[in-house]
Curated annotation (Swiss-Prot):
Organism in which the protein naturally occurs: Bordetella avium (strain 197N)
Job of this protein: ATP-dependent carboxylate-amine ligase which exhibits weak glutamate--cysteine ligase activity.
GO molecular function: ATP binding; glutamate-cysteine ligase activity
Record keyword Chloroplast present: no
Known EC number: 6.3.2.2
InterPro entries reported in the protein's UniProt record: GCL_type2/YbdK_subfam (IPR050141), GCS2 (IPR006336), Gln_synth/guanido_kin_cat_dom (IPR014746), YbdK (IPR011793)
Catalytic activity line of the entry: L-cysteine + L-glutamate + ATP = gamma-L-glutamyl-L-cysteine + ADP + phosphate + H(+)
Keywords: ATP-binding, Ligase, Nucleotide-binding
HAMAP family to which the protein is assigned, alphabetical: Glu_cys_ligase_2
Example GO biological process: modified amino acid biosynthetic process
UniProt name for this protein: Putative glutamate--cysteine ligase 2
Length: 403
């Protein structure tokens, strides 16, 4: 069995990847402009941290390693500003959000790299449908065994990350009725899912990967589209379920939340085996209903996810005080309780404009750090795109059995 070396990292360090949308400011559809944007940035100090993604309407920001979310936020703001300046120069805009509200997958162009071309050939239309946008959070760990323990420890909290970050209610001009529709695209791939519960340490992880390779199911860990996975070459655990938030500020709040949760989990016993029983159901509830979903705890109790999150924030606050991140977690908690998640904000924007193109325009403004109420210079007449179903109202429409 081939060993997989694990590069040791300092515990509790963090970093993020953000997949972002490139927008045509004339009609607010996606723009296939990543090559032009990367060329514009080629001589900029942040150039090595900005990468292409699977289709040319996407771009990815990669942070450095940080000990504190404040340093992460400063770096992400620097990269955002550089990216937006370069985007202005090539005539496009940039936004967050887990999906573009009305793009058509048939119109996407695969990026010209060997891996992306292979994925397009292997997965057909799924590769172009994979024009969705996620945030990946990396947490430093000292060893492979520690990585496996942390993956298992974080797994019951996958719904919390999904609901807090959800920003993909619209897809191809339709209100999907999901808070997070993006993960439905991810789950189409054969190796989506999670680390098997029986993989208890790094030795068993290596054995599992060897089995996948021997049977021709996977060539490398990159082929595993798991919700959370070890990243041995970085020395991290990678949380992959978050939609890209609408702002870099929210992205860094989520990273701070993950950091505090990882520290808390180091001090608690591993979740019981029965915690996996409701994994898929909890996952669906968070995607479909967001913070209003139901949640089955590792102990088997059915509660509202928002209530479980409130209790979790109480447990996290002493850890946040130790880490010096109390203000960041308090802001995330308060924003959750006051305004919900980005999916709710997007639906409110659609209610205001009644056009999805207007919603995308607001997305580009808030990503730049502007108020959604601020208007940029007048643009050319834009394509009128209306959602083909009404946005969700309050979640009193729940089936009774969920209460």
């Amino acid at each position: 069995m081939e060993q997989i070396p694990f590069v040791s990292s300092s515990p509790n360090t963090l970093g993020i990847e953000l997949e972002l949308q490139l927008i045509d400011p004339a009609g607010f559809d996606l723009a296939a402009a990543s090559d032009e944007l990367l060329a514009q940035l080629a001589n900029h100090p942040v150039a090595d941290r900005i990468k292409p993604e699977i289709t040319r309407s996407m771009i990815e920001l990669n942070s450095s390693v940080h000990e504190h979310p404040a340093g992460l936020l400063a770096e992400m703001r620097e990269m955002r500003d550089a990216l937006c300046e370069a985007a202005d120069a090539v005539g496009v805009s940039v936004s967050g959000g887990g999906t573009h509200p009305f793009m058509r997958w048939q119109e996407r162009t695969i990026s010209d790299t060997p891996r992306f071309q292979y994925l397009a050939e292997m997965y057909g239309y799924l590769a172009r449908q994979f024009t969705v946008f996620g945030q990946h959070i990396h947490l430093g760990v000292p060893s492979g065994d520690a990585a496996v323990r942390l993956v298992h420890g974080l797994s019951p909290y996958v719904p919390h990350f999904i609901a807090l970050s959800a920003s993909s209610p619209y897809r191809e001009g339709v209100d999907t009725l999901f808070s997070c529709a993006r993960l439905n695209a991810v789950n189409s791939f054969p190796l989506a899912g999670h680390l098997p519960p029986e993989v208890a340490d790094w030795y068993h992880f290596e054995a599992h990967i060897a089995q996948l390779r021997a049977s021709g199911l996977a060539e490398s860990i990159k082929d595993l589209y798991w919700d959370i996975r070890p990243k041995p070459e970085f020395g991290t655990v990678e949380i992959r379920v978050c939609d890209t938030p609408l702002t870099v500020e929210r992205a860094c709040q989520l990273a701070a939340f993950a950091q505090a949760l990882a520290v808390l989990l180091e001090r608690e016993p591993s979740p019981p085996t029965q915690a996996w029983l409701a994994y898929r159901s909890n996952h669906f509830q968070a995607c479909r209903f967001g913070l209003h979903g139901s949640y089955v705890t590792p102990g088997g109790q059915r509660v509202r996810l928002a209530d479980h999150l409130k209790a979790l924030f109480v447990r996290l606050m002493p850890v946040a005080e130790e880490l010096g991140t109390t203000d960041i977690l308090q802001s995330l908690r308060d924003e959750m309780q006051r305004g919900g998640n980005d999916a709710r904000w997007l639906r409110a924007q659609f209610h205001r404009t009644r056009e999805l193109s207007g919603t995308v325009e607001a997305m580009t403004q808030v990503f730049r750090g502007e108020s959604a109420a601020q208007r940029r210079a007048p643009q050319a007449a834009r394509r009128r795109i209306r959602a083909s179903s009404e946005p969700l109202g309050p979640m009193s429409m729940w089936p009774e059995r969920l209460h």
